[in-house]
């Protein structure tokens, strides 16, 4: 067997030509300290603020503090397996969550992973959780109503699509009930709802999901949950994950409602992280950028211009107060960021006025321009009537000699309070709200006993469905008040068959 030198040299040349040198370079650091959901790593010289990093056991982290000789990382998962000396590497990515219509009807955690036991979510679309809010020229003024189905809100503090309306009150005053009723009322409104539960008990979140399912609202709702048992980083990230999922729909021309329940717990989680990262504390031990924490979240709610597709994202943030103190740090911050607030008062709640909305201190700064014409006509004097009733009510307790005008105001006020009461999970279509408020403000209910007002209203709505569908349809389609004669005929027609209690 003869060896030919030319063949060998040709083979060697071919090998050299085909040789590819692939070197994989990754920026790696070493964990020097770990505990309480925080790790400090040496190295990672080129890491970006907010970049995802990966520990050797596969757990992800978020680079937060970029210091001279180490990086402070918040750990997004179990941290008990991470040890001093472990390797941590850059990923080159900032944190993203899955988005898209595949998430609708599902319960997910702030990382977009399903927690409802219904299998994986088949979406490949993702969006970064931190993204700039739409600019001035990309927005349009709020002009379309978002009907909550709650008379006291739609009449007194109307909400428009693209608005940010704060719901504030002590614990156990019905804040979550207001949000759930609003979500349930969006059934035929082509609206996608996102309910973000921050620091809630898992049993509470389960009840919310079951309530939504029972009313058929889970078909257009995404639930994002970071329960009280989960680490602080997930509570901090939950609202951003929720708004990111909503933005995907908004930028595609859809209308979205995002409920944050509640931002007080997110602020507390952020305070915990900041103190563990050794950032200097400020007022109430919150870090200096706690205002920016909420402003950058709520500024992402917008009504987009027609050039951008005309979509909208409406935000309903919740804040829990301590003993009605709205002058604390976080409540005043969020009040100054939002376009109005709905105060829920515990004394009203416990006296049986539910929803316990305080008409005197609740405002909507931009919702008035979104209210339909019919509603603004019938609810025009409602706020003043209620305010003067509350004032007179206090004086009337001291003396019994009241002139007729004062007595009439007290009678009308008592009926107004009764009409604005509403049962749990019983949102009302706007046309029915308009008719009952018309009956109230035009004096048709003045001769109905106060104890019968609630029953009168329930029976009246049932009567309208079978005897005055044309009137309901006219208000629904034109969004304007029908002729006074039509209203009077309908109301008087029902009053003839209504039997007052003895």
Swiss-Prot record:
Broad class of enzyme this protein falls into: translocase
Listed EC numbers: 7.1.2.2
MF terms (GO), sorted A to Z: ADP binding; ATP binding; proton-transporting ATP synthase activity, rotational mechanism
Catalytic activity as recorded in UniProt: ATP + H2O + 4 H(+)(in) = ADP + phosphate + 5 H(+)(out)
InterPro entries (UniProt xref): ATP_synth_asu-like_sf, ATP_synth_asu_C, ATP_synth_asu_C_sf, ATP_synth_F1_a_nt-bd_dom, ATP_synth_F1_asu, ATPase_a/bsu_AS, ATPase_F1/V1/A1_a/bsu_N, ATPase_F1/V1/A1_a/bsu_N_sf
Keywords: ATP synthesis, ATP-binding, Cell membrane, CF(1), Hydrogen ion transport, Ion transport, Membrane, Nucleotide-binding, Translocase, Transport
Role this protein plays: Produces ATP from ADP in the presence of a proton gradient across the membrane. The alpha chain is a regulatory subunit.
Family matches, as NCBIfam families: atpA (TIGR00962), PRK13343.1 (NF009884)
Binding partners and assembly: F-type ATPases have 2 components, CF(1) - the catalytic core - and CF(0) - the membrane proton channel. CF(1) has five subunits: alpha(3), beta(3), gamma(1), delta(1), epsilon(1). CF(0) has three main subunits: a(1), b(2) and c(9-12). The alpha and beta chains form an alternating ring which encloses part of the gamma chain. CF(1) is attached to CF(0) by a central stalk formed by the gamma and epsilon chains, while a peripheral stalk is formed by the delta and b chains.
Entries under HAMAP family matching the protein: ATP_synth_alpha_bact
Stated name of the protein: ATP synthase subunit alpha
